Amino acid sequence: MKHTLRAAVLVLALSAYAGAADRVDPTTLEGKVLFGYQGWFDCPAANPKGGWSHWARGVPSAETLVIDMYPDLSEFDRADLCAVPGMTIGDKPAYLFSARNAKVVMRHFEWMKKYGLDGVLVQRFIGGTARNRAEGDVVLHNIMAASAGTGRTFAIEYDISGGKEDTFAQQLQDDWKYLVDKAKVTSHPNYLHHKGKPVLSVWGMGLGDGKHPPAKPEDARKLVEWLESGAPAQYRVTYIGGTPSYWRTLRRDAASNPGWTAAYRAMDVVQPWTIGRYKTMPQVDEWKTNILEPDLAELKKNGQIYMPVIFPGFSWYNLNRDSAKNPIPRLRGEFLWRQAYNARAAGATVLKIAMFDEVNESTAMFKIASKRTQAPDQGFWLTLDADGADLPSDWYLRLAGEITRAFHGERPLPPELPAHP
């Protein structure tokens, strides 16, 4: 079995490297496979005021961790990382990184180029403070530099979680103006555009959990229409709406007010959130029949673009200690691959993979510790051998490279993963 896996890994490696482009075309969304990029990890060596943000509640320990997966940091200089007090891997200290370090972000983008990946949707949070924005600007600057250095494309994706009903829309508009006028994001040569306008994604409107504004669909539509056509020309965008999974039927995770249908129809691109909506391979196929295909038919009728979201697996035990460990197994990549195949077979021409660096919910696609012995001795860790397979740390980058090539029209995407341990 291991010989079969190694041979398949070699095939994937060669084809992924061959697919690497010097510069991704930033003038169109069509054919793109984009990752969500959190960029929210911090550590004291990079930012004494930031602490161990998103790694742990306080100093990392078995009791305080909020991540289940440990990144493979073997390619990073120790000077660019933070040693974790009291955590070890064998007889050596364990390390973590900060996205405020430009070299860390550059390494991530170098991986994207090496494996032929298109780029990222950079997460930006409306519900934060002015300090949060300033810290986000540091990471954004790093991303802009890394994009320039590697030819990967990027676009902003606002997460409105925690936004206030009466202020979030104005905050978003003001911040977008700031990004255009001051940060000059849309003037960057690799900022993603579509039909001559910069791409902007807004995630969270329409969710029925009461935690994501606005409550009134008319307010959502007003914001969408301002961004698409009502704003001064320099602020107008091709709009991606990060919507509930059941946006079309207004059920389950979606707000039920019928007015939301008009809000969704106003969006240039619909990107439904699917994390945790299915857990097994049969459920993935049922999702294609019951959701993907009807969604695509509806959007095609309305002249809109469909951007499905796929994910490699899910676990957030350390973040939510009452939850199970590894409740949505990765199945050696088969779970991710089948979602990509189904999206392509249904007719989708663009795709989002959640996420590049999300180790809190174990959806990370970047290099991850392969074996338990490569993660810290202290605490629970979900490593790539959890499914009984001997996988390299870059396995999911290689799979993403193959998926990207398929969406570029460079290769077919078969229903079965080409590598079986």
Where are these regions (language model features)?
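Glycan-processing catalytic domains of CAZymes
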Residues: A21-P421
